[in-house]
Structure formats: C-alpha cells, structure tokens
Amino acid sequence: MAHLTARRPQNVEGDLYVDSSCIDCDTCRWMAPNIFGRDDEQSAVFHQPETEAERLAALQAVLACPTASIGTVAPPKDMKEAQASFPIPITDNIYHCGYHSEKSYGAASYLIQRPDGNVLVDSPRFAAPLVKQLEALGGVRYLYLTHQDDVADHQQFHERFGCDRILHADDIGSGTTSVEIQLKGSDPVELAPDLTIVPVPGHTKGHTVLLYDNRILFTGDHLAWSVRLHQLHAFRSVCWYSWPEQIKSMEKLAAYDFEWVLPGHGRRHHADKATMRQHMQKCLDWMKAQ
C-alpha cells in the first residue's frame, strides 16, 4: 500500500497521491490521464478527482498500479465499486483486466470473451476480486502469453481455471517449462478460426502477437502507440533480442488487417484498417531510421 510519509511533493494537494515507490510504468497515466501526470521520472497527481467518472478512473488506477504506489489520505468508501468495474470493457467483447503485476513491470492484460472459450492475454496479478469477475464472465480457456517478460502469475491462473497456457518455445524459461502449448517456428498458428498467433521475434526471440477476429491485435511489447511521437512505434531501447529481426517482424505484421493495437506496455491505438496500414508503414519507416 502507498505510504503518506512517502508522498511525492509533485502531487497537488488533496486526498489522492502517488508515493515514491512508483516505478514509472505509465499505467495510471493512461488509465486516468486527467488525474495523473509525469514529473521527474515518476507519476504524480496533477488534478484531484472532481466528478464521479474521475473518481472511478482514479480508483481503477489505484487497483491497477503494480506497486500499490497510489493512495488516499482518507480510506475510500467506494473501492468495491471500482473492484466491480473490472475487467473494463474496451470494445465489444474485449476487456482490460487491470490489476497489473510488478513481475511484468506493470504490463497490461486483456480478456477476450468468446463462445468457444475465453482467452486471457498475458497475466495480470492473481487478485481475488479480478478472479471472481473472470469467473462470472465464463472463466479462462486459454492463457496466451506474448513473451517471457509478461507471464507474471500464470501458474496461479492455470491452477484456478485449468486453462491451457500458450508461449513460444524460444521464450520458455525456468518458470514456464510446464506451459501446455509451446509454439515452434516462425509460421503463423491458427489457434481457432478467429484466433491467429503471429511470431514476431525482436523484443525477445520468442515474442508473438495475437490477432483476434481480424480486428484486434494484442501486441505485448512488440508495438504500441507513442504519445510523444504521435505514431505507432517499437521500443528500441528495450529490444532484448534483435532490432533488425524486429523490423523484419514488423514488415510481416504490416501485411495483416486490424483496427486495434492493444499492447502490454505503451498506449493502445484504434483506427480503421486503411489508416492503420498507413500507420504501420510510418512505424516501419521510423524503425529503419533508428
């Protein structure tokens, strides 16, 4: 939990605050951009919530924060309402799970609700309120893991829901040797007619992305929207395997049609398919110039 004695001086006065344990993962800033900002490489409260919507967004950020670095001076009486709001709908049957894990440096996790079995994309924290909500939405059939960095509490979700975990063999480590479906090679894998897994080595050797319904692309740490650059981009400074390979992977990915980019880290992006193709080309041009 956040500690008032460690409250950052960059916070504005008021009930809500960020303490000095913040790891600058950006979660609160994109979940509640009217409330949180960045100052001196950490988050801070720039504006105290004034409306019910702002209050809910702020408490959702409190729950999602992977390091429990956000607190309130007065114990919140409306936290159960915030807990019940997760997972948060994004579009149609796609949800943001919240409850980010410090084990994955605060990466976002998502849920695809589908008649043939729900898919949990990357692992959130194994938090009781979230688990209860996932049960109410139909449980978890597959736990798809984009890459080795964002596996977090995968074992607990597997034990609770009996879900099959999916991870590329090149990203299997000591904590994931028991993963049920270990992908191999560089060819796309059709898990189901509406689920296509595309290997995209670069950030890690075994990184993959998941395309759902030819509309929603779950990108892990391969691709995200940059607010600073105002375009899609890749993370050159944290490319652990190969930047040239990541460029090749992005070229392959540019051949697919999709409308949403939902990343583990970075900001999400939505555009029509034609515009998204243009944004992908701009991303490639930028990558090749680095």
Where are these regions (language model features)?
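Metallo-beta-lactamase
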Residues: 40-41, 76-92, 118-120, 126-128, 132-135, 140-150, 152-205, 238-241, ...
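Cysteine-centered iron-sulfur cluster-binding motifs in ferredoxin-type domains/subunits
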Residues: 16-32, 52-68
